[in-house]
Curated annotation (Swiss-Prot):
The gene is panB. Belongs to the PanB family. Keywords: Cytoplasm, Magnesium, Metal-binding, Pantothenate biosynthesis, Transferase. Catalyzes the reversible reaction in which hydroxymethyl group from 5,10-methylenetetrahydrofolate is transferred onto alpha-ketoisovalerate to form ketopantoate. Its EC number is 2.1.2.11. This is 3-methyl-2-oxobutanoate hydroxymethyltransferase. It comes from the Bacteria. Binds 1 Mg(2+) ion per subunit. HAMAP family: PanB. 3-methyl-2-oxobutanoate binds at residues 46-47, 85, 115. It comes from Trichlorobacter lovleyi (strain ATCC BAA-1151 / DSM 17278 / SZ). One of its GO terms (biological process) is pantothenate biosynthetic process. It is an enzyme of class 2 (transferase). It is found in: Cytoplasm.
């Protein structure tokens, strides 16, 4: 039986050159399954707003919705570290509101860390939260909560943007984050940041040099057919299997071949 993954263990993994593996989960059964697969951390992402609730982006996701998902994941008692995404505007309104909301994720939700999007602009908030012993994972580069400012989900850090993202990553580390997600940036830039920082970098669309990788579970299982980013590798194709199972069920109920005596009580 593997041991519980903690934040010191995540930090040690970078020091020892061991890759950190992260997948998202939003419910109890999925959390159990990905944990059994051996992931080091489960991110309860605000991506739930898109892949679970059907929104166009993550902006509509609320604190109450995130707490619902976090509680469901925590009930699986995973060995993986549980990190809760802070939804849009949960931390942007100031330190007091950020502390209250991040505290709820740990106290009510049972998460072991939170993830806050933003770089230098959010460093004071990250510092205030970490000083209250709430562990923070940062997130720089392509930050989905900034989708309108970026004009869509576009690669960040090309040309003159590179130095800004380097500064953002450094600011997040200096503010006390234990790790930082690098999303949607050139692989060479991610490699520079990874070499520069003492904390682990977790890449998503940021190349192979990062200290770890994170992907959305629905993407690797082929459950989001309408949108598949370049950086996603599909490890299973469950969508047609689910559709076919539903089709067989409908057919058997309609023609009377289900349920049979085997599925009935005497």
């Amino acid at each position: 039986m593997r041991k519980k993954i903690t934040i010191p263990e995540i930090l040690l993994m970078k020091q020892e050159g061991r890759k950190v593996t992260v997948l998202t989960a939003y419910d109890y059964p999925t959390a159990r399954l990905v944990d059994a697969g051996g992931v080091d951390a489960i991110l309860v992402g605000d991506s739930a707003g898109v892949v679970f609730s059907g929104h166009e982006n993550t902006l509509p996701v609320t604190m109450d919705e995130m707490l619902y998902h976090v509680k469901a994941v925590v009930r699986a008692r995973p060995k993986a570290l549980v990190v809760a995404d802070m939804p849009f505007m949960a931390c942007q309104s100031g330190e007091i509101e950020a502390l209250k909301n991040c505290g709820r994720m740990l106290q009510e939700g049972g998460a072991e860390a939170v993830k806050i999007e933003g770089g230098s602009n959010m460093a004071p908030i990250i510092r205030a939260v970490t000083e209250m012993d709430i562990p923070v994972m940062g997130h720089v580069g392509l930050t989905p909560q900034s989708v309108h400012r970026m004009g869509g989900y576009k690669v960040q850090g090309r040309k003159d943007q590179a130095e800004r993202i380097l500064e953002d990553a450094h600011a997040v580390q200096e503010a006390g984050a234990f790790a930082v997600v690098l999303e949607g940036i050139p692989a060479k830039l991610a490699a520079r940041i990874t070499e520069m920082l003492e904390i682990p970098t977790i890449g998503i669309g940021a190349g192979p040099a990062c200290d770890g990788q994170v992907l959305v579970i629905h993407d690797i299982l082929g459950l989001c057919e309408k949108y598949s980013p370049k950086f996603v590798k599909r490890y299973a194709d469950l969508a047609p299997l689910i559709t076919e199972a539903a089709r067989q069920y409908v057919s058997e109920v309609k023609d009377g071949t289900f349920p049979t005596e085997e599925h009935s009580f005497s």
